[in-house]
Amino acid sequence: RAKDPIRREAYYLSKLQSIFAWRGSIVDDVISFDIIPDLNQRKPLRRQLIVQQARQLFLDQLEFAKYKRIREPGMTQKAAGRAFAALYPFDYGEEITEENLSQAWADIESALSNFLDMEDIIVPLREANYLVAQRSLMFSFDSQSIRAVPDLICFFPNKPPLIVDWKVHSYAMQNYRLQLACYATALIHCEPHRDFPASLSRWKPTDIRLLEAQLLTGVPRYYTLTDGDIEGVLSYITRTAREMDLAVDADPRPDWREELTY
């Protein structure tokens, strides 16, 4: 990638985020890498520490993005670690005001606070015997490789898994039923990771419990799937794959068609 300027630039551009998307990625990061490991180890959640961790990550990523360190020779996401970030305004020479940054931080703090206060999330997370955050689920359908990455999968000894998808949106107007249905389908049909419980095989996609958590509004939304929903997911995958094929027909490179991500 580093030897091909066009591919390198495409890599840069693929990592750029808006301020609004960035605040959500920080919330994802803190929940996935700070909160979930503590819950798996049955440690108490200390709100003040979590906010401090989030603030430090906010500052580290802001500095990384401000100086466009993603463009340093040899810089990779792995090398940068959790400080890795790239923001549109910095890359395009646009202004980010203190008001913009203050609002972004306020939203991050509010989202994390609401997460800790939402019993619809915290109670099942404490009841689960194993939590898996941001794990890729791969399966094949209709000659396509499908990849889904749920925010969180909660496994229980005697209950079907719960998939939690959190959003950091000021106005929760969109319905994410299809996205969650894709996750449920992927969980059941994927090649299980080594740490997934053997009991997963006893469940069907329609058994999976689904929770969408709007972290800025503190509103939970539950979804129950039917066989018709699962048929709709598979039809959606087929249609999406066909549209991608039509979009890239002018380019014969097969790697453009290798994977669909949801």
Task: State where each predicted segment sits.
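Charged, glycine-rich intrinsically disordered N-terminal tails and low-complexity linkers that flank
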Residues: 1-33, 38-53
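Short amphipathic alpha-helical segments and their helix-coil junctions
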Residues: 1-14, 159-164, 241-249
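Hydrophobic (often cysteine-bearing) scaffold residues that line and stabilize catalytic clefts
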Residues: 19, 23, 104, 176-179
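A residue-level signal for conserved active-site and pocket-lining positions in enzyme catalytic cores
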Residues: 27-28, 152, 183, 210
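A non-catalytic, helix-rich entry segment at domain boundaries
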Residues: 30-131
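Active-site catalytic microenvironments for nucleophilic, acid-base chemistry
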Residues: 33-38, 186-193
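Non-catalytic protein-protein interaction segments used by genome-maintenance enzymes to assemble
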Residues: 129-190
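Metal-dependent nuclease catalytic regions and adjoining charged, substrate-binding loops involved
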Residues: 142, 172, 189-262
